[in-house]
């Protein structure tokens, strides 16, 4: 591990993946990191499946996915990993749903999505899988909400989202699923909505104050954060084209309102298409794209207690468009784009005792 200004954090570098990829689907189950599908050097979706044994730090090849895909969603259900939606070799959204049985090392097909979709957001609650939104073969954003019942191997429809979108950020908090942002075609969505799992009703919350694509979102200590991104031109914006920003907007779930933090509390670097997560009372922003000609390697954290940004140790491998996954005190940053699809697997970790 390496340390720097952020003494509470360090990077752990794992052996590189056998297959370089971007838009891979990742899951963590029983101390194994699974990386499924994605796009390789040729730019086409892969059926390749690999797993990293966290104890031995060795990679193993798994049985290939029945359906090659990129940008799929994954949910862990006990000893199974369910893979939902994504895009296929002809750049068309897929309806296929497949489960990898960890103990048996094989794939099984499951009930397909009612409609093919890419950019589906998924949440697991009490053994049920909720799939929200997506983009269909007609490129139109979807408002559908479906719930998968593993025992019956079927999808059931729930009340639709008020705002159709794909690629949204979702957070489970209490008995509600919060859905933030996403896209409609090339346009970023500012909607912020919540689905009550008990009442099965939707609530519209105040929209994001600013319209940004490729922003990073995280939830911590009862607040939702929206960071950075590409700011879109608008009537109160003198820029004629999208530009990188270091904006920080925070929604207080208790008070139900957004706060746009002042310049002194913005991120140190302007960035988009980056990894964001919550570790040990900090919101962390990792890599991405900025005004430089190559991906960023810088990392920073916002201390919720001290209300300030601090520089953290830089990424060992600067990248953007990474897959990410949080498992305990580790935030994994997997694959992505450096000078092409990357094999790098690294994790930002909390030091022991912090």
Swiss-Prot record:
<feature type="repeat" description="Kelch 8">
    <location>
        <begin position="331"/>
        <end position="354"/>
    </location>
</feature>
<dbReference type="GO" id="GO:0030496">
    <property type="term" value="C:midbody"/>
</dbReference>
<dbReference type="GO" id="GO:0098813">
    <property type="term" value="P:nuclear chromosome segregation"/>
</dbReference>
<dbReference type="Pfam" id="PF24681">
    <property type="entry name" value="Kelch_KLHDC2_KLHL20_DRC7"/>
</dbReference>
<feature type="repeat" description="Kelch 6">
    <location>
        <begin position="224"/>
        <end position="281"/>
    </location>
</feature>
<dbReference type="GO" id="GO:0140014">
    <property type="term" value="P:mitotic nuclear division"/>
</dbReference>
<keyword id="KW-0131">Cell cycle</keyword>
<dbReference type="InterPro" id="IPR051746">
    <property type="entry name" value="Kelch_domain_containing_8"/>
</dbReference>
<dbReference type="InterPro" id="IPR006652">
    <property type="entry name" value="Kelch_1"/>
</dbReference>
<dbReference type="InterPro" id="IPR015915">
    <property type="entry name" value="Kelch-typ_b-propeller"/>
</dbReference>
<feature type="repeat" description="Kelch 1">
    <location>
        <begin position="1"/>
        <end position="31"/>
    </location>
</feature>
<keyword id="KW-0963">Cytoplasm</keyword>
<dbReference type="GO" id="GO:0045171">
    <property type="term" value="C:intercellular bridge"/>
</dbReference>
<keyword id="KW-0132">Cell division</keyword>
<feature type="repeat" description="Kelch 3">
    <location>
        <begin position="81"/>
        <end position="127"/>
    </location>
</feature>
<keyword id="KW-0880">Kelch repeat</keyword>
<dbReference type="GO" id="GO:0110070">
    <property type="term" value="C:cellularization cleavage furrow"/>
</dbReference>
<dbReference type="GO" id="GO:1902410">
    <property type="term" value="P:mitotic cytokinetic process"/>
</dbReference>
<dbReference type="Pfam" id="PF01344">
    <property type="entry name" value="Kelch_1"/>
</dbReference>
<feature type="repeat" description="Kelch 2">
    <location>
        <begin position="32"/>
        <end position="79"/>
    </location>
</feature>
<protein>
    <recommendedName>
        <fullName>Kelch domain-containing protein 8B</fullName>
    </recommendedName>
</protein>
<feature type="repeat" description="Kelch 5">
    <location>
        <begin position="176"/>
        <end position="222"/>
    </location>
</feature>
<dbReference type="GO" id="GO:0005829">
    <property type="term" value="C:cytosol"/>
</dbReference>
<feature type="repeat" description="Kelch 7">
    <location>
        <begin position="282"/>
        <end position="329"/>
    </location>
</feature>
<feature type="repeat" description="Kelch 4">
    <location>
        <begin position="128"/>
        <end position="175"/>
    </location>
</feature>
<comment type="function">
    <text>Involved in pinching off the separated nuclei at the cleavage furrow and in cytokinesis. Required for mitotic integrity and maintenance of chromosomal stability. Protects cells against mitotic errors, centrosomal amplification, micronucleus formation and aneuploidy. Plays a key role of midbody function involving abscission of the daughter cells during cytokinesis and appropriate chromosomal and nuclear segregation into the daughter cells.</text>
</comment>
<keyword id="KW-0677">Repeat</keyword>
<dbReference type="GO" id="GO:0005737">
    <property type="term" value="C:cytoplasm"/>
</dbReference>
């Amino acid at each position: 591990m390496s340390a720097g200004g952020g003494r509470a954090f360090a990077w752990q570098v794992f052996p590189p993946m056998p297959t370089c990829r971007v838009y891979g689907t990742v899951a963590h189950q029983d101390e194994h990191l699974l990386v499924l599908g994605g796009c390789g050097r040729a730019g086409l979706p892969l059926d390749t499946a690999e797993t990293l044994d966290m104890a031995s730090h060795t990679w193993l090849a798994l049985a290939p996915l029945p359906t090659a895909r990129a940008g799929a969603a994954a949910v862990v259900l006990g000893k199974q990993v369910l893979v939902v939606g994504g895009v296929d070799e002809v750049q068309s959204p897929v309806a296929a749903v497949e489960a990898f049985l960890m103990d048996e090392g094989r794939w099984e097909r499951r009930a397909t999505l009612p409609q093919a979709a890419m950019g589906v957001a998924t949440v697991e609650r009490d053994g049920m899988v909720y799939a929200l939104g997506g983009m269909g073969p007609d490129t139109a954003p979807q408002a559908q909400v479906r719930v998968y019942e593993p025992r019956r191997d079927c999808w059931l429809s729930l009340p639709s989202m008020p705002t159709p979108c794909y690629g949204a950020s979702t957070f489970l908090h209490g008995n509600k699923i919060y859905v933030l942002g996403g896209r409609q075609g090339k346009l970023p969505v500012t909607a912020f909505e919540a689905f009550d799992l008990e009442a099965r009703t939707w609530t519209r919350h105040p929209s994001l104050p600013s319209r940004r694509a490729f922003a990073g979102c995280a939830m911590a200590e009862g607040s939702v954060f929206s960071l950075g991104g590409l700011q879109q031109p608008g009537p109160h914006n003198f820029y004629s084209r999208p530009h990188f920003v270091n904006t920080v907007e925070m929604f207080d779930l208790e008070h139900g309102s957004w706060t746009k933090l002042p310049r002194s509390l913005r991120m140190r670097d302007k960035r988009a298409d980056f990894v964001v997560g919550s570790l040990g009372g900090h919101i962390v922003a990792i890599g991405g794209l900025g005004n430089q000609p190559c991906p960023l390697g810088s990392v920073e954290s916002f201390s919720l207690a001290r209300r300030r940004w601090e520089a953290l140790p830089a990424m060992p491998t600067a990248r953007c468009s990474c897959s990410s996954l949080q498992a305990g005190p580790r935030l994994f940053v997997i694959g992505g784009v450096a000078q092409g699809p990357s094999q790098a697997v690294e994790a930002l970790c909390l030091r022991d005792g912090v």
